[in-house]
Amino acid sequence: MVPTTHYTKSGDVHIAYQVVGEGPVDLVLIHGWTSHLEYQWEDPALARFLNRLASFSRLIVFDKRGTGLSDRVAERALPTLEQRMDDIRAVMDAAGSNRAAIFGLSEGGPLSTLFAATYPARTAALIMYGAYAKWIRSDDYPWAPTREEHEAAFKA
């Protein structure tokens, strides 16, 4: 069953979101690179994961601006990390969530970290999985993949 999709405004962009479950804690899940609210419920493994999260929380999921059911963005006006971070705030406001655990997956990690640092009073916990502090390896961060490793992964 696909939950009801709602929309809220963040600046001049409509952000699609869903709320699932009735647990004692709000949990905002921030997907990685792309997402699609309706498709995620069609993928059996992802649907099991989401249902498990919703079994102990009030799970709030959304499509980042430019992805899934949220408004598209112009190629020459790609969103900043700060704009996407403010989308989290807009979704939480629309869902009636004053404070939530923030769960960042992959590319959602930096976004989650920025939100937690900007809105500490609204962040009950910060959970990160598969996230990098930096996307590309550098002298001060030798643990990240190289540009060539990223490019090879996208070509595969």
Sequence positions of predicted segments:
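Gly/Ala-rich beta-loop-alpha elbow adjacent to hydrolase catalytic centers
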Residues: G104-G108, S112
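Short beta-strand immediately N-terminal to the catalytic nucleophile in serine-hydrolase-like folds
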Residues: I102-G104, Y129
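Short, hydrophobic/aromatic-rich segments at coil-to-beta transitions
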Residues: M1-H6
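Structural signature of beta-strand start/N-cap positions in the alpha/beta core
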Residues: R58, R99-A101, A125
